[in-house]
């Protein structure tokens, strides 16, 4: 549904987004994750047509947003980080006003407004002035205006920003519900939000895309973690006799223990995603070489660990999980 190619945005000499490319299919729930200033909001604004890219292309539902901006925008519901609300208006009047901005015909507005209010659990607040609402309810009003016209793509920028734990949980439930009918892109700097509601994550760093992976695949590494009592001078020659080991990374833990991360090439066999298939060879090689084996296990990583690793690496091409 979304095809982004080499997207860039510069402000004078500052490059806010640098040649970002990705594709998102219909029905996916994708988290756009990065520190503040990583380029998330800039990408959101370019996806919605509110900001022109300096270079690159965006196609949504097969249409170029540069040449078909209005048609593309009719497919999108957008919740900006600070959604502009009119505090003197009631919720229902504000949604009627927004329906007009979305081009919803007058005859269709009552039904669509009722639907948006019901989906965001605003029935009890529909006649209340927005000024009287809590932050959590105001965020729901922002979501309600984004889904009024039944968009095919829903873009949410920091939807849980400033909410308390109970309100965050309610917003997560709402996002999962909305994802039944629309593709959802969720921008956040909070790891837990991506883990709670997303199927896939795009991680940005300094305007560059450094990871594109499905969350379910993050724990499926082709690496073994080996801990023995010997230094690389002894261990690495033993490990290099095993053809499936393509790289060895040494991580000393104590004077008596050394950890080695082993990158594996297991081919295309059915067991290719299970690094344990090579573990017996590794164990045999190091023990026959006189090493004391402490642990040998598949390396696992969660999103927090991966995010920290990416922060420590030099910027380069995006990694795909």
Language-model segments: residues:
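ABC transporter nucleotide-binding domains
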Residues: 2-4, 9-205, 209-211
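Hydrophobic/anchoring residues in structured secondary elements
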Residues: 9, 247-250, 298
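Short secondary-structure boundary/hinge segments and terminal tails
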Residues: 76, 117, 135, 219, ...
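Surface-exposed charge patches
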Residues: 97, 115, 237, 284, ...
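Positions that flank functional sites
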Residues: 114, 132, 253-255, 301
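ABC transporter nucleotide-binding domain
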Residues: 170-266
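C-terminal coupling/interaction segments
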Residues: 267-321
């Amino acid at each position: 549904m979304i095809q982004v190619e080499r997207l860039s945005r510069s402000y004078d000499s500052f490059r806010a987004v640098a040649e970002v490319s990705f594709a998102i299919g219909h029905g996916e729930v994708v988290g756009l994750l990065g520190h503040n200033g990583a380029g998330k909001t800039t990408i959101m604004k370019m996806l919605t047509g509110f900001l022109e890219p300096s270079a690159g292309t965006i196609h949504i539902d097969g249409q170029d947003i540069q040449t078909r901006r209005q048609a593309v925008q009719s497919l999108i519901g957008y919740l900006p980080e600070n959604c502009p609300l009119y505090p003197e208006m009631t919720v229902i009047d504000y949604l009627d006003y927004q329906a007009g901005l979305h081009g919803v015909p007058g005859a269709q507005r009552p039904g669509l407004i009722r639907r948006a209010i019901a989906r965001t659990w605003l029935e009890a607040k529909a006649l209340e002035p927005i000024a009287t609402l809590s932050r959590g309810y105001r965020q729901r009003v922002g979501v309600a205006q984004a889904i009024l016209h039944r968009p095919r793509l829903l873009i949410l920028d920091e939807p849980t920003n400033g909410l308390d734990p109970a309100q965050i949980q309610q917003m997560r439930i709402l996002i999962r519900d909305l994802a039944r009918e629309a593709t959802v892109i969720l921008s956040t700097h909070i790891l837990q939000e991506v883990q709670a509601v997303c199927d896939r994550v795009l991680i940005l760093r300094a305007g560059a895309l450094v990871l594109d992976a499905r969350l379910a695949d993050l724990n499926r590494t082709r690496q073994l973690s080996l801990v023995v009592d010997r230094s690389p001078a002894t261990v690495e020659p033993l490990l290099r006799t095993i053809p499936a080991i393509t790289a060895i990374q040494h991580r000393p833990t104590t004077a008596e223990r050394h950890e080695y991360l082993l990158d594996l090439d297991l081919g295309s066999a059915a067991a290719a995603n299970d690094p344990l298939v090579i573990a017996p060879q590794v164990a045999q090689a190091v023990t026959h070489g006189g090493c004391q084996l402490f642990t040998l296990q598949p390396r696992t990583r969660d999103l927090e660990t991966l995010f920290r690793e990416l922060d420590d690496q030099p910027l380069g091409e995006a990694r795909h999980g």
